[in-house]
Amino acid sequence: MENEDTGTVHLRRIDPSQNMRRFYVLAIQPTLFGGASVIRNWGRIGTSGQSKIETFDSDYDAATAAMRLQKAKRRRGYRDDGTT
């Protein structure tokens, strides 16, 4: 689910037959020097998970990378979190 104010996307993938309960969060934040960063957080639901930050020179490049990551996760079975 995308938060309109921050551009944050919360996804989850739950498959009880495989004991799989995963989350994936994507956010775009401005940097101090005029670029933008894509912040990813992922892991098992109930844990703090792992994080990765990728910095880009422009907002457009960051948004393109975030959309590419979001599409890849949706192809793998991740769906909107459903929380607000």
Show where each model-derived region lies.
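A generic structural signal for ordered alpha-helices
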Residues: E4-G7, P16, R40, R44-T47, ...
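Solvent-exposed, flexible loop/coil residues
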Residues: S37, Y60, G82
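Short, charged/polar low-complexity linear motifs in solvent-exposed/disordered segments
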Residues: I53-D57, D81-T84
